[in-house]
Amino acid sequence: ARDSKRIWLDSKEIHHGEYVWKMKKAGDVISSAEKVSTLGYDTSDWLSAIVPGTVLNSLVYNKEYPEPYYGVNNKLESGKIPDISKVGREFYTYWFRTEFDVPESFAGKTIWLQPDGVNYRAEIWVNGNLLSTLNGMFISDYINVTDFVKVGRKNILAVKVYPVDVPGTTMPKSWGATGEFHNGGNGNIGLNTTMLMSVGW
């Protein structure tokens, strides 16, 4: 915690926060979302997760895949990191989960949960309750969790993160791509809600 009114749920891994985050591929989780987001659920076979972070950088941290920025590890032809256009969205859909305490000093106050930078879709579960669904690039939300958290006790936050709806492919390049998206791959990535940016050299 950085002040008495806010709690940052940063992971111990990499960020040196106070919270243990775990992750597991959603397709390998047979339990219901309600159970996953409930106290006592067994995550002993889940991987450590980096939060804030991404599915891929957590997988790289766990040595599931090599560092994408080294050499040609990230080239499609290398096959070292599965490309979503080949393996599908489910391959990179993951659960993230942590436990957190709500201080006694929060009693009688309105308590908000503020997820930041979600990409691309997410379900936000707290203590067995689906409280929000997010859609878009680097999305934030403000969720009133007052009636769903237990003050002075341990609580569970579980987030199911989905990649973009239409990943597109790295090739072939298409001049007939959707809208203005002519610069890479088949342009289908532009069918998703994205952010405006400009690049140049």
Model-identified regions with their sequence ranges:
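Mature N-terminal segment immediately following signal peptide/propeptide cleavage
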Residues: 8, 12-25, 39-49
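Intrinsically disordered, low-complexity coil segments
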Residues: 15-19, 75-83, 150
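Short linear sequence elements within intrinsically disordered, low-complexity coil regions
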Residues: 26-28, 46, 51, 66, ...
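Surface-exposed, low-complexity/disordered Ser/Thr/Gly/Pro/Asn-rich loops and linkers
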Residues: 58-87
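Short, polar loop/linker segments at the starts of domains and inter-domain junctions
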Residues: 30-41, 59-69
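Accessory beta-strand-rich segments of carbohydrate-active enzymes
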Residues: 2-5, 19-28, 32, 54, ...
